[in-house]
Amino acid sequence: MREPSAELIIDIDRIRNNIIYLKSLLKPDTKFMAILKANAYGHGLNIISKSIDDLVDGYGLVRLEEATSVRKYTSKKILLMQGVYSEDDFKIAYDNKFDLVVHNKNQLFAFENSDINIWLKVNTGMNRLGFLPEEIISLHKLYDLDKRKYVLMSHLACSDNPKDQLNEKQFKSFDQLADSLEANFESSEDQTLVIKIFSLGIHFL
């Protein structure tokens, strides 16, 4: 009796064409980040990232080991999507110029360094990672975030179904928070910094 077998064939040209097509749907100045967590979803992190590096503006990864591996052959932005939890890991992230997601209170020490790019995650309805909107307001005041640049981000729970009503609720919650933060910023003394707003939803390889 023959053993069952399976073969996965990865077509790099099709992956590249997918990215080119997706970018054609976006405004010309829109940045494109490739989310390649979990070994590029099992496709092979190194071969995929090297093959698409000329098409993307950065990478989203979870494990520090994967991020340092990709950094060896690209200078583009690398986002650690679940941040770091220790001072040692923070130093590695800092030395490699990684951006960090901050999504819980155990990661707030990252705000003590003003030279690292922070993406502050707000839970608008997915209920997996991130601070509640009212917690973001408190953090904004506690850490004087109107004095530094950071990215406000969220994650759509139903991005595969554009008609789902939860999407609209999440966007509304996100926009309300962003408007509130911008209002606080505009009333501050320093007018040279800008709060960057970014809504993370659909993951494309």
Listing of model-derived features with the role each one plays in the protein:
Residues R2, A6-I10, R14-N17, T30-S180, ...:
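Active-site-proximal beta-alpha core segment in soluble small-molecule metabolic enzymes
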Residues L25-K27:
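Terminal domain-start leader segments
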Residues E186:
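Ligand-binding/active-site lining segments
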Residues T192:
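Histidine- and/or cysteine-centered catalytic micro-motif in compact active-site loops
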Residues K196-L205:
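Active-site loop ensemble at the mouth of alpha/beta enzyme cores that anchors a bound cofactor
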